[in-house]
Curated annotation (Swiss-Prot):
The gene is FSD1. Residues 4-99 form a coiled coil. Keywords: Cell cycle, Cell division, Coiled coil, Cytoplasm, Cytoskeleton, Methylation, Microtubule, Mitosis, Nucleus. GO terms for molecular function: identical protein binding; microtubule binding. May be involved in microtubule organization and stabilization. Changing T322A: In mitosis, remained associated with microtubules. B30.2 box contains a microtubule-binding site. This is Fibronectin type III and SPRY domain-containing protein 1.
């Protein structure tokens, strides 16, 4: 019966997953139908606009060329008409001289003949007919204004839709996730010299496998990529995976997106568990601030709840002006809250295997600050590093400045400048807990031990504040140092 029940549960789970996939696909099909209508209307509108632009351009060219013909015809007509008028006048003058010369020749016996002959000779010399060019000033040939649009007609006949770039193919073998950076590499299935740039889109997700259509996280867009690879830097991996897709663009149009891929982005994510914190610590997600009145405010509220001390605080009293620490639900319960001089707060995520890395930046003016790890069983009165259940690096700015590594109430003074940002690397299976200058990755100290219980990130602060950064991968520099064995030293054995 139990086996049948378990088999039925598996069937139900399989059906539920399949139903979700089908629903997602139905949503995709409906969205595609809407997109087909919208996109076809858009491209039809664009096509009509392009042809209208061509019609307008051809009409403008036609008007301009007709105007050129009309201007050339008017200019030639004007020149020929002027030349015709001049020739007509010259011909009339020449005919008059010819008639006069014939008449004078017939009157050779007249005593006026010599004088008349001389006048005719002088008239011929000055006659327009002998100064007139008998070559037309312009040609009647209009061949320079003829056109042959055969080539252009062929070009118009060759009009077609733009060639769309092929969808790129993302090369998972060459892509890399490391140091909170993602290098994505892709290639084109066919050589295309007209590609101008690429567009990369990515988003965070907690779901493995093909990207889902309905996601809470939006696609982030990077445009103008000229190469077939791109590196995203300075990422915070606060989700388990990232989706990626790429499309190619030429000068006019973008192609289809590549098949989306999902890359795993392993990193250690946790928040501070406010329910474990000392009452003098004001906890807000990943930051902590010392609150000297925190405990007193809680005591006042507790008495008011019990019906004791119902007298209201003065309007300007610290108790009224200081808010209580922010609380978060946790399995530890209120009874396990750190108290007395253990100004401690723990992370909310257990470390029970693998390698993990996080960083913490503390206020340099803090009188005391500590960072490390602890077993969940760390007592509520116990301070970090003073029991066998915790390991930490401790900075003390009160009275005398000190920078120490602490475990099981043993202390090692560190001979190194105190950085304002510390990196913590925990390799659970190897039993290594290393502290680094987060900026330079200089090793400050390494505990080498054997962890017998799951660990929690642990922090302590007195009269100060700090900010934790999670979602970080183990830096490559840290891995290299660990492989070379330079992260350990014989002097650390006394604190294991």
């Amino acid at each position: 019966m139990e086996e049948q029940r378990e088999a039925l549960r598996k069937i139900i789970k399989t059906l539920a997953v399949k139903n979700e996939e089908i629903q997602s696909f139905i949503y995709s099909l409906k969205q595609m139908l809407l997109n087909v209508e919208a996109n076809s209307a858009k491209v039809q509108e664009d096509l009509e606009a392009e042809f209208q632009s061509l019609f307008s351009l051809l009409e403008e060219l036609k008007e301009g060329m007709l105007m050129k013909i009309k201007q050339d015809r008017a200019s030639r007509t004007y020149e020929l008409q002027n030349q015709l008028a001049a020739c007509t006048r010259a011909l009339e003058s020449s005919e008059e001289l010819l008639e006069t010369a014939n008449q004078t020749l017939q009157a050779m016996d007249s005593e006026d003949f010599p004088q008349a002959a001389k006048q005719i000779k002088d008239g011929v010399t000055m006659a327009p007919a002998f100064r007139l060019s008998l070559k037309a000033k312009v040609s009647d040939n209009m061949s320079h204004l003829m056109v042959d649009f055969a080539q252009e007609r062929q070009m118009l006949q060759a009009l077609k839709f733009l060639p769309v770039p092929s969808a790129p193919v993302i090369d998972l073998a060459e892509s890399l996730v490391a140091d909170n950076c993602v290098t994505l590499v892709w290639r084109m299935p066919d050589e295309d010299s007209k590609i101008d740039h690429y567009v990369l889109e990515y988003r965070r997700t907690n779901f493995e496998g093909p990207p889902r259509l309905k996601e809470d996280q939006p696609w982030m867009v990077i445009e103008g990529i000229r190469q077939t690879e791109y590196t995203l830097t300075g990422l915070k991996f606060d989700m388990k995976y990232m989706n990626f897709r790429v499309k190619a663009c030429n000068k006019a149009v973008a192609g289809e997106f590549s098949e989306p891929v999902t890359l795993e982005t392993p990193a250690f994510m946790f928040r501070l568990d406010a329910s474990t914190s000392h009452q003098n610590l004001r906890v807000d997600d990943l930051s902590v601030e010392w609150d000297a009145m925190g405990g007193k405010v809680q005591d006042i509220k507790a008495r008011e709840k019990d019906g004791k001390g119902r007298t209201a605080s003065p309007i300007n009293s610290p108790a009224r002006g200081t808010p209580s620490p922010k609380r978060m639900p946790s399995g530890r319960g209120g009874r396990d809250r750190f108290t007395a001089e253990s100004y401690t707060v723990l992370g909310d995520t257990l470390i029970d295997g693998g390698e993990h890395y996080w960083e913490v930046r503390y206020e340099p003016d803090s009188k005391a600050f500590g960072v490390g790890v602890a077993y969940r069983s760390l007592g509520r009165f116990e301070q970090l590093g003073k029991t066998a259940a915790s390991w930490c690096l401790h900075v003390n700015n009160w009275l005398q400045v000190s920078f120490t590594a602490k475990h099981a109430n043993k202390v090692k003074v560190l001979d190194a400048p105190v950085p304002d940002c510390l990196g913590v690397h925990c390799d659970f299976h190897q039993g290594l807990l290393s502290f680094y200058n987060a900026r330079t990755k200089q090793v400050l100290h390494t505990f080498k031990t054997r962890f017998t219980q799951p660990l929690l990130p642990a922090f302590t602060v007195w009269c100060g504040s700090f900010q934790v950064t999670t979602g970080l991968q183990v830096p490559s520099a840290v891995r290299c140092l660990q492989k070379r064995g330079s992260a350990t030293s014989s002097s650390n054995t006394s604190l294991t």
